[in-house]
Swiss-Prot record:
Biased composition (Acidic residues): 123-135
Chain intervals for the UniProt region annotation (Disordered): 1-34, 115-151, 255-297
Biased composition (Low complexity): 136-150
Protein name: Ezy-1 protein
Domain of life: Eukaryota
Gene name, Swiss-Prot/TrEMBL: Ezy-1
Compositional bias segments (type: Basic and acidic residues): 259-269
Amino acid sequence: MAAVVGTGSDGGGDESGDRRTADAADADGDGDGGERAWLRFKADVRACLADLRNRKGGITLHRAIVKDMVSASSNPGARRSSSSVVKMAREELDRLMPFLLDDFLDNMPGLKAAFTGKAEPGAEGDDGEDEEEGEAQGVGKDAVDSSSSSSGGGGVLSCTAWQQVLGRTVPAVSPTLALVLACGYLAMAPRQYRALALVPMILPGKTGGGVDGALTREGLSLLKKLRPGISGLADKDKQWLEWVIARLAAEFAVQPAGDGHEPEPKRPELPPTAVQREPPAEEQHKPTAGARDSPNM
């Protein structure tokens, strides 16, 4: 599917293009929920990238994402060396990003199928095998829930399919872009998946921004909340830690309470002294209120 990509005054992609196409399909009654969800997802990812570029220090992540996509792209027009990306001015990065992103999303194995539930054109093997494989991986016809969407129509990914979308981004050589894809999904997520709103907290804060160096204090705090007993972090780089947070946040969203209701508060554990306390001897032999009222007494 060719996406509508343009360059605005800031050099970013026209993230409203796909959304306008999806809205037109809604108005005409054309297209299915999965196709509309796919177009909206692409538009939301572009919007997330545009927002990222405008943040303080966002150029560092912006450059890292371009470098990741250049490495993953098989398109001859996208061939660049990592060293040339490092030296690129912001204007050149802005011009290259929309082209790379469109190519990257369209060619990431199984990504579009996770939204549409359909075998992708040109996929290897016959249609029957593709359909079986898609359904076995949780990206078949049940992957998209068309009953609700905060975007106003269209489908939303099931949590199982969403975790697979996030998981495919690392083999595609872009753990950094995985975080942006996570943010792009938020605009479409039904309210029971609101725990995924934790993911934007992974992106650089005021302390320790960028893709290199130590994890931000906010990110480290979030990681420990999601997995209290986690250890062995000293030898891990920041991208690995950010990826772990993204996965844990997605897992948190699919815990049993993710049915649209607030989770039942956990009962506090009594301290050992309270648990082991014996009642006074005179209280042990007192009849209960029910026993006193019994006709047999």
